[in-house]
Amino acid sequence: MTTAATPVRRAVRQDPAERRRALYHLASPVSVLTTGPEERMHGTTASTVTLVSRSPLLVGVVLRAGSSFARLAAAEGRFAINVLGGEQADVARRFADSSRPDGSASFAGLAWTADRYAQAPLIAGALAHYVCRFHSAHAAGDSELLLGHVVRATADEGLPLLSYTGGLFAGSLRPAKETAAS
């Protein structure tokens, strides 16, 4: 297949607030990323986690540029992704709070177990856990894309915690209405 190059057009001027409002309509599951071991534990909330490749199985996480999590995950060589359930908004807020304590103190009072491979906390009640080997990190504008090679994944039943229009929602997943093909 041959594709012709599209001429580059001048950027359209648009109010940044309007673009931001439009982006708020991208609903996404909320996860807490963790790395360990216990003496170097760290967690952070992320709402942009996606499948990048099925073979090899790679997931991507978008973080703020200069994120300490990306640096720590690279140094440890492994990390975990905890996909939060609809009743775990408090966990998401805890790890999104920049004034939270460092290290294991940020996990105080939270039920978790250390993964035997990653030594990272797997948060109890999460809908899914992806244990990853660090693959790479890439600068992407004002963000950083962290890629992980999934070495183990587990899933449970329940509704997801979703980020939508700037808020957190306990996901109510209704099947879309089907219409007859015309």
Q: Predicted regions span which residues?
A:
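Basic, polyanion-binding surface patches
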Residues: 2-182
